Amino acid sequence: MPGRTPTYKLPPLPRLKVKKPVIKQEANRCLVLMSNLLQCWSSNGHMNPVCEKLATDLKACTSQNVMGSNQKPRKSTINYHAARLYDRISGKPHD
């Protein structure tokens, strides 16, 4: 069949691996509260009673996280799932 273009296959990979997986980190709650408090103060004036709830929330948040969180940073699971599902996505022929 001279009219068909040849199809090229990629060489098989020993494993599928992402070198630097990016984990979406959630925003620090205390930083969000502090930003809201500063914005409230700039709009309403320093120590305005309108901003009192934000100030107490920020104090509570910072007292809970005095020494930082003891949680380890989460590892990405992309490489685990890529290895687990490699047979399905590598294009191997079916039974």
UniProtKB/Swiss-Prot annotation:
Domain (CHCH) spans: 27-69
Q: Which InterPro entries match?
A: CHCH, Ribosomal_mS37_fun
**UniProt motif (Cx9C motif 1) ranges:** 30-40
- The record's disulfide annotation reads 30-61, 40-51
The subcellular localization recorded is: Mitochondrion
Pfam families cross-referenced by the UniProt entry:
CHCH
Instruction: Tell me what this protein is called.
Output: Small ribosomal subunit protein mS37
> What species does this protein belong to?
Eremothecium gossypii (strain ATCC 10895 / CBS 109.51 / FGSC 9923 / NRRL Y-1056)
Q: Which gene encodes it?
A: MRP10
